[in-house]
From Swiss-Prot:
Localization per record: Nucleus
This protein's UniProt keywords: Developmental protein, DNA-binding, Homeobox, Nucleus
SMART domains named in the record: HOX
DNA-binding interval(s): 38-97
GO molecular function, one term: DNA-binding transcription factor activity, RNA polymerase II-specific
PANTHER family cross-referenced by the UniProt entry: HOMEOBOX PROTEIN, HOMEOBOX PROTEIN OTX2
Gene3D superfamilies on file: Homeodomain-like
Protein name stated in the entry: Homeobox protein OTX2-A
Domain of life where this protein originates: Eukaryota
UniProt feature, compositional bias: Low complexity: 95-106
InterPro entries: HD (IPR001356), Homeobox_CS (IPR017970), Homeodomain-like_sf (IPR009057), Otx2_TF (IPR003022), Otx_TF (IPR003025), Otx_TF_C (IPR013851)
One GO CC term on file: nucleus
One biological process term in Gene Ontology: regulation of transcription by RNA polymerase II
Amino acid sequence: MMSYLKQPPYAVNGLSLTASGMDLLHQSVGYPATPRKQRRERTTFTRAQLDILEALFAKTRYPDIFMREEVALKINLPESRVQVWFKNRRAKCRQQQQQQQNGGQNKVRPSKKKTSPVREVSSESGTSGQFSPPSSTSVPVISSSTAPVSIWSPASVSPLSDPLSTSSSCMQRSYPMTYTQASGYSQGYAGSTSYFGGMDCGSYLSPMHHQLSGPGATLSPMGTNAVTSHLNQSPVALSSQAYGASSLGFNSTDCLDYKDQTASWKLNFNADCLDYKDQTSSWKFQVL
């Protein structure tokens, strides 16, 4: 035990730590305070000094040592102060230029954002303008139900009853052939399925044996202008329905006997039933 205590001090990297050296690590031992670097006082420039420095900065942003010393003698300041002033002045100038560029970009960007809603509004107005003609054409169709004269009902047959005159749309038919009749009316039908749209019923229901009120007129199934002109004279308008398995909305006791043939069209009004005869298939509709 005694031999262990008498061993030489432990060596670290060739340096022996003695007991006296260990005392330096004790808390009670005071260490010499490091000298604190004193802060340099801020230099204040007068108006005359700033005028001289600004005049030199206007000539050159990077003056050499001789120019700085000459100006330092004029303003009674050390050359190091003049050098620092030019350094700060260049940094300030770069900052102002960057702010101007950013400000210009920020002004341009909102203008781009403002133009995009204008384009959207114009596109919306364009789309609404495209859909406005159908709405304008539908207005005279609604107002045409009060006209007193029938254009397709023959004189020998009474027109349909009042419930049919309450609706504002007429029947529109399409057939795959074009029929030209002896009475001088040209009717073109396209498509295989028949349906009821907003077109003139007189253009499709007027038979070849009955003449319309307007002599020599050519009835087009897709002409909306002719539709409105004929509807202004007709009190009868049929509701928009699919012409197929569904029944027709006839509230009158009159019946429509419609025969579809390749060479002739016949329209008859009977008393109790609606009989629709076709070559390919037979459909019978009766009002209950």
